[in-house]
Curated annotation (Swiss-Prot):
<comment type="pathway">
    <text>Carotenoid biosynthesis; lycopene biosynthesis.</text>
</comment>
<keyword id="KW-0472">Membrane</keyword>
<keyword id="KW-0125">Carotenoid biosynthesis</keyword>
<dbReference type="InterPro" id="IPR014102">
    <property type="entry name" value="Phytoene_desaturase"/>
</dbReference>
<keyword id="KW-0560">Oxidoreductase</keyword>
<dbReference type="InterPro" id="IPR002937">
    <property type="entry name" value="Amino_oxidase"/>
</dbReference>
<keyword id="KW-1003">Cell membrane</keyword>
<protein>
    <recommendedName>
        <fullName>15-cis-phytoene desaturase</fullName>
        <ecNumber>1.3.5.5</ecNumber>
    </recommendedName>
</protein>
<comment type="similarity">
    <text>Belongs to the carotenoid/retinoid oxidoreductase family.</text>
</comment>
<dbReference type="GO" id="GO:0009635">
    <property type="term" value="P:response to herbicide"/>
</dbReference>
<dbReference type="GO" id="GO:0016117">
    <property type="term" value="P:carotenoid biosynthetic process"/>
</dbReference>
<dbReference type="Pfam" id="PF01593">
    <property type="entry name" value="Amino_oxidase"/>
</dbReference>
<keyword id="KW-0359">Herbicide resistance</keyword>
<dbReference type="InterPro" id="IPR036188">
    <property type="entry name" value="FAD/NAD-bd_sf"/>
</dbReference>
<dbReference type="InterPro" id="IPR050464">
    <property type="entry name" value="Zeta_carotene_desat/Oxidored"/>
</dbReference>
<keyword id="KW-0520">NAD</keyword>
<dbReference type="GO" id="GO:0016166">
    <property type="term" value="F:phytoene dehydrogenase activity"/>
</dbReference>
Amino acid sequence: MRVAIAGAGLAGLSCAKYLADAGHTPIVYERRDVLGGKVAAWKDEDGDWYETGLHIFFGAYPNMLQLFKELNIEDRLQWKSHSMIFNQPTKPGTYSRFDFPDIPAPINGVAAILSNNDMLTWEEKIKFGLGLLPAMIRGQSYVEEMDQYSWTEWLRKQNIPERVNDEVFIAMAKALNFIDPDEISATVVLTALNRFLQEKKGSMMAFLDGAPPERLCQPIVEHVQARGGDVLLNAPLKEFVLNDDSSVQAFRIAGIKGQEEQLIEADAYVSALPVDPLKLLLPDAWKAMPYFQQLDGLQGVPVINIHLWFDRKLTDIDHLLFSRSPLLSVYADMSNTCREYEDPDRSMLELVFAPAKDWIGRSDEDILAATMAEIEKLFPQHFSGENPARLRKYKIVKTPLSVYKATPGRQQYRPDQASPIANFFLTGDYTMQRYLASMEGAVLSGKLTAQAIIARQDELQRRSSGRPLAASQA
């Protein structure tokens, strides 16, 4: 079968990869001139990369890790020590660690929590552990039921002290979905905790050894092309052209950069667009369908990614750091953590600015000033005295609508990958799969979409038999 896919983010590329593996011919159409969607990156005038986000790969990402294995690029993951490292706001410039020993789960997670005496008291640890028991015993069904509560509401329901939220979960909620624990669904945090506690290396983290478009997305493209498929850039989806029965007749691809507008016909069609632009493109004939109406309950969350190049080393820590700043989420010195960005003498900090709803419309200068004020608290030793560290340059990447905002009650709005339109499918981390808004969720959704298309293969081929499948000029 020939399958047209709109969007070359991880979900669209994953879908194409697994369709190609099954002997089908996926053609991916990407609006921009760069691969990756939410993992896109660009080079500046000096040849330095700047990215859409700070992308972390966890041991609890089975589909992502399987993808790396199938592409034979596992060596591109740079695994870090099995730890979680938090800044201590009351002791600027110092850190508190949760170190996971090399013993089976969940004992290693329990040991990591119990051995940290900087952030939680013994009473808080015990109450937190008791509060988690229902999730650990009842598993995913309980985790899904808790979507009715925010994380803060769930903590109170379980009689877990507020200070546990302040010390640990403000930072974790911002890392998971770029919002505070008062807003994030308990399902999101419990899903992460369940994976971290039930899998020995679930919370172990890796960085990619370079920019995602080159080091992860391009190998997928080459894999697809080697099997007869293709990925085309500068090819934005303009319209779903429908048949009389509301099925898809063609993708209308806009003509940009001197290209002609095209009508793309295929046996099956996939939207791998984020949920917000997809809603803008929905044909009137589909808008009354409950399946598509549920998308109105989903909306992307704003996030800002910041890159700061300094004239000296600010830290030698080769790991992700939880800032515990009111403005910043996680950060890392990419000159330590990423092989391609390595610099033994100068730091390049990449930081996630979240929650960003009050800042996404502000100027880059305002955002930089606020960020630098926080940086001076994180690294006070480098910004005092006669020779303070100097910022050489910076890049700020704003994403007004990133992954779907995982507030309570969102699970009911997440659609299945197979739509009620016989030849139309959705893929993306917002579709229903257990890994929520994440790179793992995107890859898994792509795989599930490919499986859904293959399951409808006979029907799809019957529908399109006798019809030319080539592209034509509109």
